[in-house]
């Protein structure tokens, strides 16, 4: 089974709260059970790669907010749990950690990776975490992609509410 684990933080590269711990531990545990799990996360300016070996494994374009945007994909093997992590890089949308466009852009980029088969790997399930990744299931359905989605809400207090505009 192939699982793509979409999340907005991943310990030890960037950790804001408990979700970063979950993003490190759960994929590692599933990998030991034989699941081909890969984590996908924004490559914020504040991400600390340190001495971890990273490789640029892809570059693609998406349409977002009426404009073309380029996204780079950087791959790292998680130093503790040995699963593959993909970091999506785009200076305009991922320089800031918090922003409504950050999450919309991230969701669109994740779905375009699958739609365009950028990684030459397709998930059976996308496990999305919290409101940050909440658009992904809707976009999967909109594009009729042959992928199941699962949403985990880790903290109901953070619902991602924002103005409609």
Regions from the PLM with identified roles:
Residues 1-165:
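Catalytic cores of nucleotide-sugar-dependent glycosyltransferases that transfer UDP/GDP/TDP-activated
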């Amino acid at each position: 089974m192939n699982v793509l684990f979409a999340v907005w933080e991943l310990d030890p590269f960037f950790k804001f709260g408990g979700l970063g711990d979950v993003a490190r531990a759960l994929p590692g545990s599933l990998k030991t059970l034989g699941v081909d799990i890969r984590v996908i996360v924004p490559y914020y300016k504040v991400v600390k790669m340190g001495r971890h070996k990273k490789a640029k494994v892809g570059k693609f374009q998406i349409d977002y907010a009426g404009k073309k945007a380029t996204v780079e994909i950087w791959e790292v093997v998680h130093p503790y749990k040995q699963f593959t992590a993909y970091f999506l890089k785009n200076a305009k949308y991922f320089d800031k950690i918090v922003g409504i466009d950050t999450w919309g852009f991230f969701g669109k980029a994740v779905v375009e990776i699958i739609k365009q088969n950028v990684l030459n790997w397709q998930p059976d399930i996308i496990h999305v975490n919290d409101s940050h990744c909440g658009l992904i299931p809707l976009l999967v359905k909109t594009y009729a992609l042959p992928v199941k989605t699962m949403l985990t809400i880790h903290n109901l207090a953070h619902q991602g509410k924002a103005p409609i505009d």
